[in-house]
Amino acid sequence: MVTVVDRVTNRRLRHPEKAHRPDTSVQKKPDWIRVKAPTSPVYKETHGIVRTHKLVTVCEEAGCPNIGECWSQRHASFMILGEICTRACAFCNVATGIPLAVDDDEPERVADAVARMELKHVVITSVDRDDLADGGAEHFAKVIYAIRRKAPKTTIEVLTPDFRHKDGALEVVVAAKPDVFNHNLETVPSKYLKVRPGARYFHSIRLLQRVKELDPTIFTKSGIMVGLGEERNEILQLMDDLRTADVDFMTIGQYLQPTRKHHPVIRFVPPEEFESFAKIGKVKGFLHMASNPLTRSSHHAGDDFAILQKARDEKFALQR
């Protein structure tokens, strides 16, 4: 995911707000979590394109375990609006601090990268920009419009912040007509004060519901991490809340602790439990479920979009 400002190079300064916290041990990952180090020529080529365009990827910033697989298939997700977030979530490895000014040239450069990489599907995300009057909504829209001009065959997925206290911001993004609107709940409501203190659970639910009210043709999507100390019944209730908001697609993945200063992993959830959540989600009415220890919001996003389209077509066919 992409921005064109200079990267944060001093990792010790990435999370100044966490410096006072005691270290917590980082648990050894189970075998089902481990992935191979990236070595393919296509991975190196993708890495070169990212560097040539002076882009910063959330794949790197967030320490995503799937970077080798995704970049080897030339899949990329771009992070706009800088690399410094105004919030300090306990799970996230993206740098926290005072962001730089918005780069007005960024939409065109992101679109150029999408066109050059010949992406069939692209994910656009951002850091939280509580410092901006619209939370960065207009910039999201400009990126979408730029991609439509330079890569008209590419389908577009946005993964947005919550635009809390930003009246009219959501409407700006929806009016730009992304194909998929994703906003992650991240965790169950009982964990928000500790894990996602700057957000409000039911505000996020309402945001997703409002997207469907504004434009029913846009697929809606949300995801959570497990292993933060949540209970199974809380996850099932969260699924019901998402379905009440008419969300089409849900992702569930294992939380991995970025550093000793971040929220500890309470539990590594075994693969069979993820499979169980996927089956339950389908019964509850989601068009698609991606539930796997290594599942992340943008993982296999292009393939998932094709599945969503097919599932919706089949659903409408049955209703005729």
Curated annotation (Swiss-Prot):
Binds 2 [4Fe-4S] clusters per subunit. One cluster is coordinated with 3 cysteines and an exchangeable S-adenosyl-L-methionine. Pfam families: Radical_SAM. [4Fe-4S] cluster 1 binds at C59, C64, C70, S298. Its EC number is 2.8.1.8. GO terms for cellular component: cytoplasm. The keyword Cell inner membrane does not apply. Keywords: 4Fe-4S, Cytoplasm, Iron, Iron-sulfur, Metal-binding, S-adenosyl-L-methionine, Transferase. [4Fe-4S] cluster 2 binds at C85, C89, C92. Residues 19-29 have a biased composition (Basic and acidic residues). Residues 71-287 form the Radical SAM core domain. It catalyses: [[Fe-S] cluster scaffold protein carrying a second [4Fe-4S](2+) cluster] + N(6)-octanoyl-L-lysyl-[protein] + 2 oxidized [2Fe-2S]-[ferredoxin] + 2 S-adenosyl-L-methionine + 4 H(+) = [[Fe-S] cluster scaffold protein] + N(6)-[(R)-dihydrolipoyl]-L-lysyl-[protein] + 4 Fe(3+) + 2 hydrogen sulfide + 2 5'-deoxyadenosine + 2 L-methionine + 2 reduced [2Fe-2S]-[ferredoxin]. Gene3D superfamilies: Aldolase class I. It comes from the Bacteria. Residues 1-29 are annotated as: Disordered. The keyword Cytoplasm applies. Its cofactor is [4Fe-4S] cluster. PROSITE patterns: RADICAL_SAM. One of its GO terms (molecular function) is metal ion binding. Its main location: cytoplasm. It is found in: Cytoplasm. Pathway: Protein modification; protein lipoylation via endogenous pathway; protein N(6)-(lipoyl)lysine from octanoyl-[acyl-carrier-protein]: step 2/2. Belongs to the radical SAM superfamily. Lipoyl synthase family. PANTHER family: LIPOYL SYNTHASE, LIPOYL SYNTHASE, MITOCHONDRIAL. This is Lipoyl synthase. It comes from Bartonella tribocorum (strain CIP 105476 / IBS 506). The lineage of its organism: Bacteria, Pseudomonadati, Pseudomonadota, Alphaproteobacteria, Hyphomicrobiales.
